[in-house]
Every structure is written in structure tokens, then in C-alpha cells.
Curated annotation (Swiss-Prot):
It comes from Shewanella loihica (strain ATCC BAA-1088 / PV-4). Homodimer. Pfam families: tRNA-synt_2, tRNA_anti-codon. It is an enzyme of class 6 (ligase). GO terms for molecular function: asparagine-tRNA ligase activity; ATP binding; nucleic acid binding. This is Asparagine--tRNA ligase. InterPro entries: Aa-tRNA-synt_II, aa-tRNA-synth_II, aa-tRNA-synth_II/BPL/LPL, Asn-tRNA-ligase, Asp/Asn-tRNA-synth_IIb, NA-bd_OB-fold, NA-bd_OB_tRNA. Its EC number is 6.1.1.22. It catalyses: tRNA(Asn) + L-asparagine + ATP = L-asparaginyl-tRNA(Asn) + AMP + diphosphate + H(+). Its main location: cytoplasm.
């Protein structure tokens, strides 16, 4: 007898007639007048449950089988047979059911077999993985995570684990979570009354990282091609469907690469990931197409078969100004493109993924390479139909004098970035990279529009439960 996952049964890993044991949770129980119960049991390994046909001849049929409700955990053993019913290839003729865990009160069980709003499920983050939608999101998220690591491994990149605690603000925006062990009731003070952070754990102000990029650059300038993949934090008080306080970022960094090189890398990576999901998680995608967004499969297939368009920011502004469409946010050179502008470019003008390049320097970070015109930097955004910006990247400023000028312009301390400046003093090299918000990628693939529903335990303003 073999212990089998439901996914392995449906993949045909076990021959018809095999004795198998499946361990999981009851999704539904249906009783027939002929003295047979049908148990739908899932274990999370794939979207569909497996049906167990349970005869009333089992010793515990009356005492236990007929009491099973959604959420009860069971170990079910029986013979694998071809299913005469529609919708599944196999089912089990059950010879034994062991109940390992009961639902205490089925009438008040929050995950009873009925449809719940996604907003309601957010309040039950510890139980929502048991639902179809969150289980499917988790499997797609896992698939995408593996695809990212596989892609970079095949491309010859080295994964680098950058620190979560840092003293530098990569974005220069100041929206950072402070890390401190100081006694808030008895803060040490300097002579001028300010908090004395020299008494703190690290001897200085420290924060949760907003990006692994700056640390990643140090390794790219020694190992040539690296990537980071880990959590990042933004203390941005935005209570929207697009923002989280804690989220995951994928950040490759490539030495001897310019902006066009990493634009090509971004295109290859996204297509690799989408092909992986289309090949490996078709069952979950079909659910999303049926219940969430009917265009998800078509959108991904179109994406992998499209060539990316490219346009300069200045030309994109002219396209938006002359298109005749009324936007909520006015369009003029120097603005940061809003979601409505990005989606118009990708969905209506180019009708394809598009890379917008060479943004005004005043709306971009200090580390982006200044172009010859002195007004723009070698920055890019990858815009995807259906969501807008999905990747942001840039060629890094490798010239020390220009970098110092940019730090001064933005009021940032050169002393704080002494180690980052050292990279430009010792064998400087052109290098480029980008950042991909992983949750935004999962949202795009699944069609689940609120980013709080594509991460297991969302962290947002006034929300850090579980």
C-alpha cells in the first residue's frame, strides 16, 4: 500500500487497481439512499479533491462517516479505480477511513462549504488556505517562486541573501520602519535633546530594508551576475489594494550591462515564469479563469507570444497628450506616469508589454545613471497589459563625481553611503538591474486584484494580525 498525494494520483503515478492511502481534509460528504457515502477529500497538492466511495459496510460508517463535515481530517485507504463520473479520471473504492481530527461545531465552522467574500477571508487568514481561491494562489505563488530561481540558475546568476536590517535608504524616500531596542519609556538623549541612537543595539539608527539593491550591487561588482529574492518593507501609509508594508522583491544586478541588457533580461524572465505556470498549474489557472478573471489564461498566453515594445518617456508623454483620451491625472513632461497612463500605453496604444525608458531625473532615485542630456536618467519601467507597471529598473551611476552630485542634489549624506561610493573608487564598472514586486506578479498571473490576497499574511497600516 502506498501513501499518495491527490496530485500524484491524478497524474497517473499509480496504476488502476493499486491500493493507495490519501491523507487530507473533507471538502464535502454526500450520502446516497443505497447506503454509500461520497467523500471529496483534498490535500492541497492540486486543485481538485479526490472522491472516495465509502460503503456502509465499514465498521465506523454509522458512528463516524455519517458525522463527517467540511474540514474534518481523514486518512482514506482503498482501491484506485477509473471514475464513471464526469470531471475526474480516478476515484477510490474505500476500504478504510480513519478520522484524525473533527470540526468541533460544524454550524459555526468559518470555512464551511459555502462561498465567502475575499474580504471576509482576509479576517480569517489562519483558515483561508483551506478555500479554493487561496489554496490556488498558494500553489501559483510556489510555482512562480521556483520558476524565478530556476530561471536565474539557468542564466548563470548567483543568489545573494541581502540583509533585512540596514542603515541606508535605497529609495531616498524615508518611508522606513525603524529597528530599535531602546526603552520607549526612558529614551536616552543627546545634549541637544535628540534621541541618542549611539545607545541603541547597533550604535546608530537602523531600519528594515526597502530594497536589497545597494547591497546586491556590491556582489554584482565582484561576481558579475547576482539576484536577490526576499522580503522588503515600506512604512508607506497607503491603505490600497496595491500596497503592502511587507512584500517580496526579486532584484537581479548585472555587471557590464546597460539598460537595454536588463530590459531583455526582464522580458526573458517574465516569459519563463508565465510559461512555467501555464505548463504546471493549468488546473489552478482554469479556476481563476472561471471564478476570478476569465482572461487570465488568454492574457498569459498572449504575453509569452508578444514582443516587448520600447518607447522613450518623452515620446510616451507625446503619445498620451495627443491620444484624445481624458485622463484623471494631467499629462505633462516631468510627471511620474500614473496607472491609467501606463495601462493606456500597454493596452490601447501598443497592445503589448512595453518598456518605457529614460525618465526625468527629478522623479527618480539618486543611483540611476544620468544621461548625456543632463535631464533624464537611464531608468525603465516594464508595463504589462492588465496591470501597468510590473518591473522598475535602471542602469546604475558608476561615475563617482556624478553620483556625489546626485547625492548632494537630493540632500543625502555621502558619509552614509561611503561603502556604496567605494564601488566607484575601486574598479568601477557599468552595471544595471531591476526590481520585481513578487506579489504584483502573483496578482497579475491569478487575476486576484487585491495584493493582500496573494501573500499568506498581509501586513498593512493598522493590520498586523496573525
Amino acid at each position: 500500500m502506498s501513501i499518495a498525494s491527490v496530485a500524484s494520483v491524478f497524474k497517473g503515478d499509480f496504476a488502476v487497481g493499486s491500493q493507495v492511502t490519501v491523507r487530507g481534509w473533507v471538502r464535502t460528504r454526500r450520502d446516497s439512499k443505497a447506503g454509500i457515502s461520497f467523500l471529496a477529500v483534498y490535500d492541497g497538492s492540486c486543485f481538485d479533491p479526490i472522491q472516495g466511495v465509502v460503503p456502509n459496510s465499514l465498521d465506523n460508517y454509522n458512528d463516524e462517516i455519517l458525522r463527517l463535515t467540511a474540514g474534518c481530517s481523514v486518512v482514506m485507504t482503498g482501491e484506485l479505480v477509473e471514475s464513471p463520473g464526469k470531471g475526474q479520471a480516478f476515484e477510490m473504492q474505500v476500504t478504510k477511513v480513519e478520522v484524525t481530527g473533527w470540526v468541533e461545531d460544524p454550524d459555526t465552522y468559518p470555512m464551511a462549504a459555502k462561498r465567502h467574500s475575499i474580504e471576509h477571508l482576509r479576517e480569517l487568514a489562519h483558515l483561508r488556505p483551506r478555500t479554493n481561491i487561496i489554496g490556488a494562489v498558494a500553489r501559483v505563488r510556489n510555482c512562480l517562486s521556483h520558476a524565478i530561481h530556476n530561471f536565474y540558475n539557468e542564466e548563470g546568476f548567483i543568489w545573494v541573501s541581502t540583509p533585512l536590517i540596514t542603515a541606508s535608504d535605497c529609495e531616498g524616500a524615508g518611508e522606513m520602519f525603524r529597528v530599535s531596542t531602546l526603552d520607549l519609556e526612558n529614551l536616552p538623549r543627546t545634549d541637544d535633546g535628540k534621541v541618542d541612537f549611539s545607545e541603541d543595539f547597533f550604535g546608530k539608527e537602523s531600519f528594515l530594508t526597502v530594497s536589497g539593491q545597494l547591497n546586491g550591487e556590491t556582489y554584482a561588482c565582484a561576481l558579475s551576475k547576482i539576484y536577490t529574492f526576499g522580503p522588503t518593507f515600506r512604512a508607506e501609509n497607503s491603505n490600497t489594494s496595491r500596497h503592502l508594508a511587507e512584500f517580496w522583491m526579486v532584484e537581479p544586478e548585472v555587471a557590464f550591462a546597460d539598460l537595454n541588457d536588463v530590459a531583455g533580461l526582464a522580458e526573458r524572465m517574465l516569459k519563463y515564469c508565465f510559461r512555467a505556470v501555464l505548463n504546471e498549474r493549468r488546473d489552478d489557472l482554469e479556476f481563476f479563469a472561471q471564478r476570478v478573471d476569465k482572461t487570465v489564461i488568454e492574457r498569459l498566453e498572449s504575453f509569452v507570444n508578444s514582443d516587448f515594445a520600447q518607447v522613450d518617456y518623452t515620446d510616451a508623454i507625446e503619445i498620451l497628450k495627443s491620444c484624445g483620451k481624458k485622463f484623471e491625472f494631467d499629462v505633462e513632461w516631468g510627471i511620474d506616469l500614473q496607472s491609467e497612463h501606463e495601462r493606456y500605453l500597454a493596452e490601447e496604444h501598443f497592445k503589448a508589454p512595453v518598456v518605457v525608458k529614460n525618465y526625468p531625473k527629478d522623479i527618480k532615485a539618486f543611483y540611476m545613471r544620468l544621461n548625456e542630456d543632463g535631464k533624464t536618467v537611464a531608468a525603465m519601467d516594464v508595463l504589462a497589459p492588465g496591470i501597468g507597471e510590473i518591473i522598475g529598473g535602471a542602469q546604475r551611476e558608476e561615475r563617482l563625481d556624478v553620483l556625489d552630485t546626485r547625492l548632494d542634489e537630493m540632500g543625502l549624506s555621502k558619509e552614509d553611503y561611503w561603502w556604496y561610493r567605494d564601488l566607484r573608487r575601486y574598479g568601477t564598472v557599468p552595471h544595471s538591474g531591476f526590481g520585481l514586486g513578487f506579489e504584483r506578479l502573483v496578482s497579475y498571473v491569478t487575476g486576484v486584484s487585491n495584493i493582500r490576497d496573494v501573500i499568506p499574511f498581509p501586513r498593512a497600516p493598522k493590520s498586523a494580525n496573525f
